[in-house]
Design a protein with these regions (language model features):
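Hydrophobic packing and interface segments
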Residues: 1-734
Length: 734
């Protein structure tokens, strides 16, 4: 029966892709509106596709170099499974494909959303949200399809081990983890490159357009406005999609590997198989329930911000409640060991996700006191806005960190059967909590991708000169999108923390495989005693490698990992600064040299601004991304396994907190500006408004470049460590 249940996984992936195609066709049947609306949307679409084409060329070259390296390691030195190079490629391919399909949908949806808003608010919401659902369903559909494909392929190709029957599933799951590195590598380039692009355009448009020229946002007279709208798609759609594709696959694969490891050496292959497929089944049922939630989202015509939020919240909450019930049923039918408490670990993951989302909303939405106070600080100038925003971001880390810590302890405690010594099942519980948090990704990512679609729709309506009523509706949709985007960023960061911890535990399992490939049969433990490699527990490996806080190699790795988070942020912030400087100079040049732009008599050179952002992003994204890949390899060669574990712990702990701080500071600065633009503290054009625009400009790379990229840095370093475990075990200096 258990084998039959597995087929639910590929079936759910196909269902997600079919529904994504259905929503895409439904959106394409809507009218794009007036000729001017079509022209503007075409400019944005052309710019977005041009950027993506250039990005994939660079990513393709990086992938080619890495595939050659992995092939040498696998076929030349036998340091990896021979399937690794191909698995790595498929992970990157499907991650890139999900970003491409989601962005293509978003660029076609913006004008259609603006045009639908001419009819009614609900019609605009439906078009934007269903278009966002294409991204959500494509990500989960392709992710589960890739996982199903590799599981079935490796199950057929890897022979059974009669001497150690539980070894086969360990080899399968650790090999599958390597396609997660492909997804992580592609995601980092998408996030960093997209973030640099969108913020260079945004900062240039805001500083020169709003502050210097005094023209509104999305005004067609601003040369950077098309590049700004393109950036919303490449950063917030393609980048976010690749980020969450990686988290989704990574959490499922890491949990499956931990499930296999929990039963290593027991001979209980039946229970081991159940532990491996449980996260896949939870994700599969989550797809079905996400689809139900998507269909449940609708609102009334006279709805305000609260009703719009409630409409999206109802769909997401419905899916979450149903997945809780379904998880208990799945694990009960599956008959997995300790099924009741493992089901509770899934609930813990969902609750942690909700708490982080609500905390993010509280600290970043203009509906609440923290952001309103941030707006008020603009009375004394931009310096106090910056100071207050940094303080707000630091304070906002408290609730998410406490939530994640509670989630780790509770899920470990529940899954281990209230026995902290049962490390294998405890770590499996943490992985299951991460899967639970991401189980309804189909609808949570739909609400996230909705944001940039609504933002672009508002820009299209402004540039097309649609009526005040239409602009009011698109503003309502856009404002809702800013809140869902901020919540989505918090959700992505929280899921990265749990997934990163599960991947860290999976690294130990990959060390087992690496030692076996070297021919090491027995671990000689310090102080006497020995244990067979195949039967060694997590504690045995920690003891063997002396992974303690008194080991200087572990401490050195922790310091390097903590440094990596700050170094990476610094590099990406500076990259945005340099690219934005080029954009500012170009916008000033056009205002100066092209007569009649500000009076509306001449059209700006939009293409030139798009070109500047594209080139800047491509050039600046390479070094930070390659550094993230190189750090675990160099640390492993210098300090061995203890150093790599320290690196991953340091990167995870500092990266998680820093990511929350940056995302929430940036989100609060953005909405503080919007709160003033609603007419508070003097409204648009006032000194307070100018101060909050400066805050928003500083916050742009915080929330859309450096902060979100840290999620991927955390997971990519773990993925690289896992793939390079054989190299670390064989060739480390110490």
């Amino acid at each position: 029966m258990e084998t039959g249940l597995f087929w639910i996984v590929p079936a759910a992936s196909v269902l997600a892709l079919v529904l994504a195609w259905y929503f895409y066709r439904q959106m394409m049947q809507e009218s794009e509106g007036t000729p001017l609306m079509i022209k503007i949307a075409s400019h944005v679409r052309k710019g977005a596709m041009s950027y993506l084409k250039q990005q994939y060329k660079i990513v393709g070259m990086v992938f080619l170099a890495l595939v050659i390296l992995f092939s040498i390691m696998a076929y030349g030195f036998d340091l990896q499974n021979h399937w690794v190079p191909i698995a790595f490629l498929t992970g990157g391919f499907f991650s890139g494909l999900s970003g491409y399909l989601g962005m293509k949908t978003a660029t076609y949806a913006s004008a259609r959303t603006a045009n639908a808003a001419r009819s009614s608010l609900n019609k605009g919401l439906q078009v934007a949200f269903r278009s966002g659902a294409v991204m959500g369903l494509v990500v989960v559909g392709l992710g589960l399809f890739d996982i199903s494909f590799w599981y079935l392929l490796l199950d057929k190709c890897i022979p059974d081990d009669t001497m150690n029957p539980t070894a086969k599933l360990c080899i399968i799951t650790t090999t599958m983890l390597t396609f997660g590195m492909g997804a992580s590598t592609q995601a980092l380039f998408a996030r960093v490159g997209g973030g640099i692009y969108t913020k260079a355009a945004d900062v240039g448009a805001d500083l020169v357009g709003k502050v210097e020229a005094g023209i509104p946002e999305d005004d067609p007279r601003n040369p950077a406005t098309i590049a700004d709208n393109v950036g919303d798609n490449v950063g917030d759609v393609a980048g976010m999609g690749a980020d969450l594709y990686e988290s989704y696959c990574g959490s499922i694969l890491a949990t499956a590997a931990l499930g296999a490891a929990a039963f290593i050496g027991t001979g209980n292959t039946e229970m081991q198989f159940k532990a491996v497929i449980a996260p896949m089944l939870i994700a599969a049922i989550g797809i079905v329930l996400s689809i139900i939630g998507i269909f449940a989202v609708r609102t009334k015509e006279d709805a305000g911000m609260k009703q719009l939020l409630n409409a999206l919240g109802f769909g997401t909450n419905l899916s979450s409640v149903l997945i809780v019930i379904a998880t208990f049923l799945i694990l009960w039918v599956l008959g997995i060991q300790n099924w009741l408490y493992i089901s509770m670990a899934v609930v813990v993951g969902l609750i942690v996700g909700i708490v982080i989302g609500r905390s993010t909303e509280y600290y970043t939405s203009q509906s609440y006191r923290p952001t309103q106070q941030l707006s008020e600080s603009g009375k004394t100038g931009p310096a106090t806005v910056i100071i207050s925003g940094i303080g707000l971001g630091m304070i906002s880390t408290t609730i998410p960190v406490i939530a994640v810590v509670a989630g780790i302890i509770l899920s470990y405690w529940l899954a281990s059967g209230f026995d902290f010594a049962n490390i294998g099942m405890g770590l499996y519980g943490i992985g299951i909590a991460a899967v639970g948090m991401l189980s309804t990704l189909g609808i949570t990512l739909a609400t996230d991708a909705y944001g940039p679609i609504a933002d672009n729709a508002g820009g299209n309506a402004e540039m097309s000169g649609l009526g005040a009523e239409v602009r009011k509706r698109t503003d309502a949709l856009d404002s809702l999108g800013n809140t869902t985007a901020a919540t989505g960023k918090g959700f992505a960061i929280g899921s990265a923390a749990l997934t990163g911890l599960a991947l860290l535990a999976s690294y130990i399992e990959e060390i087992r495989i690496g030692l076996s490939r070297l021919g090491t049969e027995v671990l000689e433990l310090p102080g006497g005693g020995s244990v067979n490699v195949h039967n060694a527990t997590f504690t045995d490996f920690m003891f063997y490698y002396d992974v303690t806080l008194m080991n200087p190699k572990v401490l050195s790795g922790m310091f390097v990992g903590s440094m990596m988070a700050f170094l990476f942020c610094g590099l990406t912030m500076n990259a945005v600064g340099r690219a934005a400087a080029h954009m500012v100079e170009e916008v000033r040049r056009q205002f100066r040299e092209i007569k009649g732009i500000l009076t509306g008599e001449a059209e700006p050179d939009y293409a030139r601004c798009v070109q500047i952002s594209t080139k800047g992003a491509q050039r600046e994204m390479i070094f930070p991304s390659l550094l993230a890949i190189a750090a675990p390899i160099i640390t492993g060669l210098l300090f061995g396994v203890p150093g790599v574990i320290g690196l991953l712990i340091g990167g995870l702990s500092s990266g998680f907190v820093l990511a929350i701080f940056m995302a929430n500071s940036g989100g609060a600065w953005d909405n503080a500006k919007k709160y003033v633009e609603e007419g508070n503290f003097g409204g648009k054009g006032s000194e307070v408004h100018k101060a909050t625009v400066v805050g928003d400009t500083v916050g742009d790379p915080f929330k859309d470049t450096s902060g979100p990229s840290l999620n991927i840095l955390i997971k990519l370093m773990s993925m690289v460590a896992i793939v390079m475990a054989g190299l670390t075990v064989s060739w480390s200096l110490f």
